[in-house]
Amino acid sequence: MISAYEQLVAEGYLNSQKGSGFYVAVELPEQYLPEPSSVQRDSSPKAHFDINRAFAPGVPDLDAFPMAQWQKLLTRHMSRTCLLGNQDIQGSWTLRCALADYLASSRSVNCSPERIIITSGAQQALSIATMVVLKQGDKVLMEQPGYAQMRKLIQFQNYQFEPLFVREKLGFDVEAVTSSDADALYITPSNQYPMGTTLNTEQRGKIINWAVEQSSWIIEDDYDSEFQFAHRPYTSLQGLAAQMGRDDRVLYVGSFSKVMFNGLRLGYLVVPERLVEQCLVVKDALSGDSPTHTQEALADFITEGGLLRHIRKMRRLYKTKHEQMHLSIQQYFGDRVCVVSQAAGLHITLKWQDGMDEQRFTKMAEHEGSSCDL
């Protein structure tokens, strides 16, 4: 009841007098809220589309996340008034220190906290990276098929797109890179999306040498690198480049969307020291700083061992799910489909052997409440 009166006061229909009560306003508002038209009332969607439904691409097992522990960490920092104001646009120092240690131990990334920029997910990191090292008209060599959002970014920024065709099981031909005059190469070397191939150490070395000799840039998206089921993951390309003394042309991108949950919207960009200030200028123009309470909670989640424990648990869970999915595909589809991706990550890539209409199959999957990408 009180809320209703307060709303009428806010809209100008009533006046409030302390100790006396509410009175009808002498001067009523000049405009009244219009009555919703019949079109507006009937325009609600007929069916709710759950973007996190079964087999939705890129969505981790949200039910398996330790939400109680995460809520405890958030609560720990919500009462810190020092976090309520403007913050360092580069990101929380505590988080960058924790992240530098984590990346060094888990992915052999060579970086200091000063070279890490916290972003609103991997997509913002990719936007910053390309805007700093490229100009309109520059040529970007990119895996095909590949990450659709990166393809959109290339088109939006008016870069030239040069496809780097990925073969089943084999990956792309490294000679296609070393013979290219592209200004930048975007790759997912640890688990190519969506074909699931991996670059070995020799191939990575050739690509690093090409970038240095051609004064080109490598943008390494370490997509799904935490979830390898068939073999131990290779170290990051950036880490190998540092061992070779040639990491000055590599920008490293990652996020926590797959290892934690998509709604976190925290990613990171590791760049050569000489690019840090330029990246911060671009980030400031795009969005400013990232939510600080969440960053501080994530820093604690990393340093207190919560992230590693969660990753180990999810690696076992996803391996079991991957094996079961593979068996189910064989059981229900037999020789009609071929699995072309490796045992890694949160997706399985299929190839139809009998000319199945992908559009028809997608509609059938949607009818059953599932999702698949074409």
Identify what each model region corresponds to.
Residues 2-75, 84, 280, 284-291, ...:
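N-terminal basic, amphipathic alpha-helical segments
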Residues 15-16, 111, 372-373:
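Short beta-strand "wing" residues that participate in macromolecule-binding interfaces
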Residues 56-57, 165, 186-188, 219-222, ...:
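Short beta-strand segments
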Residues 70, 245-246, 251-316:
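Conserved core segment of the aminotransferase class I/II
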Residues 77, 81-215, 219, 225-227, ...:
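Conserved core of the PLP fold type I
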Residues 117, 162-164, 251, 340, ...:
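General small-molecule cofactor/ligand-binding pocket signal
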Residues 227, 366-374:
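Conserved PLP cofactor-binding pocket of PLP-dependent enzymes
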